């Protein structure tokens, strides 16, 4: 049957889209509550004394300065014992996958003897991997991205990324590569991504997307940071080519990188920086060894500090989207076959009519009962009670006919618009009256057919 109004037969489902949703927000005012302080002996044999939180605070090596996290080193005293005092912070939380976004104003680096890093690793190294997002030694100019794994992971030497692959095998024991070198990608954006030039340009953002298939790392200088990087739902697909890419068919990331903590630290000398010292034309002239230079020159490391605006970790999920607004519907139902929906409505239709007489040969009903099956049959019998469709017993006996009918309603579903509330489209009163009138006509027709054919109860 047709109606001239719009009918609402169901609520519109809220749509959602797969995107990144914020899981952990590392801000300066809560930063030190979310990290643990590593204070054991450095595993890379660095000349460094890592302090616990209380001692680091007492020596003013940590804090919040200019609304940013400050992580510094001792730059006032000649080093003794295990080395120059510094800090190594690791997230209390362990991660598997995610989007890690860090906004950094200033980093250590560019000074002889320093070995700063922003990285992730697992307690089951190298089986569960290590990822270096920022790392360098001595007077290095460009940032190095690296992945360290067990055997069975190699990356393509060319691909959809901007960096330059130095070594392709991520295995820390790979033949033909330095021990623990892993797969190394050098940033080709010049010196803006590391050390003094990074600091002079007020830093930038490092964003790392880690999935089962691949790890991609972007570096954005301050003036090139995408608008959505610090939004509720950042979208890496809009950021262009990453600086580094680890993955592909020769490296199942889901197998090799798991259970990672995020780490910031500043070390001195150690395996990498020590090894580079003799061949460094500038550093090697300052002292015979890296350790001697770091020990005797505290003021050289005043600028060896991290200043971090924030770090955020996102995970993929489904974010709700609001239904779009639509113009007010027209006064009559338009022909929109792509939006058409049908609903089958079954109900018990009950009506009472007088028996056929000379004055009423068809026995047409005097008044229909409710059109809703929820109300049930109305009282019958000709007593004059409320709801009785028969007049008082001055006429012949009444007969009650009950028919069961199934109707199919065809309606046009329209999006919610300004005239709606909460996405629910109201049914115009004119449309409801249409339904009632049509239902009455159908009942009269049914009663006439029953009467002619002699069907009654």
Swiss-Prot record:
Extent of Low complexity compositional bias: 333-352, 368-378
UniProt keyword list: Carbohydrate metabolism, Cellulose degradation, Glycoprotein, Glycosidase, Hydrolase, Polysaccharide degradation, Secreted, Signal
Domain GH16: 19-319
GO biological process: cellulose catabolic process
Active site: 130, 135
MF-aspect GO terms: endo-1,3(4)-beta-glucanase activity
Residue numbers spanned by region Disordered: 318-397
Cysteine-cysteine disulfides: none
Superkingdom in the source lineage: Eukaryota
Matches recorded under InterPro entries: ConA-like_dom_sf, GH16, Glycosyl_Hydrlase_16
Compartments where located: Secreted
Family: Belongs to the glycosyl hydrolase 16 family.
Entry protein name: Endo-1,3(4)-beta-glucanase ARB_04519
Species name: Arthroderma benhamiae (strain ATCC MYA-4681 / CBS 112371) (Trichophyton mentagrophytes)
């Amino acid at each position: 049957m047709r109606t001239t109004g719009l009918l609402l037969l169901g609520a519109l489902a809220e749509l959602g889209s797969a995107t990144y949703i914020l899981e952990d927000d590392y801000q300066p005012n809560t930063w030190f509550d979310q990290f643990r302080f590593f204070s054991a002996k450095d595993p890379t044999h660095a000349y460094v004394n890592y302090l616990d939180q209380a001692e680091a605070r007492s020596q003013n090596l940590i804090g919040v300065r200019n609304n940013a996290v400050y992580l510094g080193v001792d730059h006032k005293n000649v080093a003794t014992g295990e080395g120059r005092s510094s800090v190594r912070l690791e997230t209390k939380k362990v991660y598997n996958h995610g989007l890690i976004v860090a906004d950094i104003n200033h980093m250590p680096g560019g000074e002889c003897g320093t070995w700063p890093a922003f990285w992730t690793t697992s307690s089951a190294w190298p089986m569960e991997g290590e990822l270096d997002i920022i790392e360098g030694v001595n007077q290095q100019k460009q940032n190095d991205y690296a992945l360290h794994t067990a055997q069975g992971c190699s990356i393509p030497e060319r691909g959809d990324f901007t960096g330059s692959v130095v070594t392709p095998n991520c295995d820390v024991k790979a033949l033909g590569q330095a021990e623990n070198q892993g797969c190394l990608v050098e940033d080709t954006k010049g010196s803006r991504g590391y050390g003094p030039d990074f600091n002079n340009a007020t830093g930038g953002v490092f964003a790392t997307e880690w999935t089962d298939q691949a790890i991609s790392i972007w570096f954005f200088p301050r003036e090139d940071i995408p608008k959505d990087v610090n939004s509720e739902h950042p979208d890496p697909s809009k950021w262009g080519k990453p600086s580094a890419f680890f993955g592909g068919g020769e490296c199942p990331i889901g197998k090799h990188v798991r259970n990672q903590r995020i780490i910031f630290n500043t070390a001195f000398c150690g395996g990498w920086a020590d090894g580079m010292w003799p061949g460094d034309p500038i550093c090697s002239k300052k002292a015979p060894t890296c350790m001697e230079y770091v020990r005797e020159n505290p003021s050289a490391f005043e600028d060896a500090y991290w200043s971090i605006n924030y770090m955020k970790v996102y995970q993929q999920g489904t974010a709700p989207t609001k239904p779009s607004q639509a113009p007010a519907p027209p006064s009559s139902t338009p022909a929109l076959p792509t939006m058409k929906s049908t609903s089958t409505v079954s109900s018990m239709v009950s009506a009472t009519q007088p028996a056929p007489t000379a004055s009423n040969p068809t026995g047409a009903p005097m008044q229909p009962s409710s059109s809703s099956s929820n109300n049930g049959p109305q009282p019958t019998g000709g007593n004059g009670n409320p709801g009785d469709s028969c007049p008082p017993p001055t006429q012949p006996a009444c007969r009650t006919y009950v028919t069961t009918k199934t109707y199919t309603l065809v309606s046009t579903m329209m999006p919610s618009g300004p005239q709606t509330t909460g996405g629910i489209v109201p049914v115009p009163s004119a449309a409801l009256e249409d339904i009632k009138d049509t239902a009455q006509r159908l009942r009269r027709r049914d009663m006439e057919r029953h009467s002619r054919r002699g069907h009654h109860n």
